[in-house]
Curated annotation (Swiss-Prot):
It catalyses: 7-phospho-2-dehydro-3-deoxy-D-arabino-heptonate = 3-dehydroquinate + phosphate. Its main location: cytoplasm. GO terms for cellular component: cytoplasm. This is 3-dehydroquinate synthase.
Length: 349
């Protein structure tokens, strides 16, 4: 005996990304602004001057990837419960990628889902993390292993927030821009080689190009069942680097930069990429003072950590490897010998 449930309705998760000065936002509901202590001190007053709401609350978390955990999620949820938020209430994620991911995840599970808006304040979150609906938190097994797809209702990219960005945070954002270019757009990569991203008008053009690339990919593959997985270039290795260093040595974008160099090394071994192309990628990363070397502490443990990657299975590790600049392949056909050869090379540095 069977009872069939027909669930083929298409949910419209469309939204706009607005680039420019943040407009005044009006809400006829309760709103919780989730931020961290650093952004609160720098920009919260400016943000609050732009918000009109029925009731407005601020949830301030500690700053850092090491706080992207269940305790921080519980802090957000407690604030929502204590102030009687309902399904029509709203969360505003005001910070970098960590705040955006956790705010979105809290929104996805509170009363089985409420709306949220992204107002990213770092270059990395403006060009990548705020768009696409990936939300989540870390645990002791790895990065972003707990989470959900939950699209924001809107994203506001205000360059004003980048004026206080530390140089390392700026570089971390550039790493994600480079990732987009290597993955999908050779012309964009060549633009970045020529560009001086310290100039605001050139940076804004790079942000726009990166967002256009991300939007195109997410439109085609919202839940990462195919082409969107290509945007994890550098992340398979990078996430292990972050976890191995307890999220304290490298910013996320810095770990991704290291991961791209490692992925390129594997692509060379697989005859997917010429060494001269890998050197161009490395040079572009170094142009913005990003790390491109890493000494793996325990090669065997590093290898085993790959199996916790969301793209991998019990028996195969999925890698995103460049086919030159502007194209990549998603493959689980890399043999153990090749993987260990690459890891051993980095283990000897």
């Amino acid at each position: 005996m069977q009872v069939h449930i027909e669930l083929k309705k298409v949910v419209d998760n469309s939204y706009d990304i607005t680039i420019g000065t943040l407009p005044t936002l009006h809400f006829d509901t309760k709103v919780a602004v989730v931020t961290n202590s650093t952004i609160s001190a720098l920009h919260l007053e400016y943000l609050l001057s732009k918000i009109s709401a029925k009731e407005l609350y601020v949830v301030t978390l500690r700053d850092g990837e090491e706080y992207k955990n269940q305790q921080s999620i519980d802090t957000i949820l407690e604030a929502l419960f204590e102030n009687r938020f309902n399904r029509k209430s709203m969360i505003i994620a005001f910070g970098g990628g960590v705040i955006g991911d956790m705010s979105g995840y809290a929104a996805s599970i509170y009363q089985r889902g409420i709306d949220f808006i992204q107002i990213p304040t770092t270059l990395l979150s403006q060009v990548d993390a705020s768009v696409g609906g990936k939300t989540g938190m870390n645990n002791r097994y790895g990065k972003n292993l707990v989470g959900a797809f939950h699209q924001p209702r809107a994203v506001y990219i205000d360059p004003h927030f980048l004026t206080t960005l530390p140089p390392r945070e700026f570089g971390a954002g550039v790493a994600e821009i480079v990732k987009m270019a290597v993955t999908f757009d050779k012309d964009f990569f060549e633009f970045l080689e020529r560009a001086d991203l310290s100039k605001p008008e050139i940076l804004q053009e790079a942000i726009k190009k990166a967002l256009q690339t991300k939007a195109k990919v997410v439109t085609q593959d919202e839940k990462e069942q195919g082409i969107r997985a290509a945007l994890n270039y550098g992340h398979t290795f990078g996430h292990v680097v972050e976890n191995e260093t307890a999220y304290k040595e490298f910013l996320h974008g810095e770990a991704v930069a290291i991961g791209m160099v490692m992925a390129n090394e594997m692509a060379i071994k697989m005859n997917y990429m010429f060494e001269k192309e890998a050197l161009r990628v490395k040079a572009l990363l170094q142009k913005y003072n990003l790390p491109t070397t890493y000494a793996i502490k325990d090669v065997k443990a590093f290898y085993e950590a790959f199996f916790l990657d969301k793209k991998s299975s019990d028996s195969a590790i999925t890698f995103i490897l460049p086919l030159g600049i502007g194209d990549v392949v998603i493959t689980d056909k890399v043999d153990t010998g090749t993987i260990m050869c690459v890891l051993n090379k980095f283990g000897k540095q």
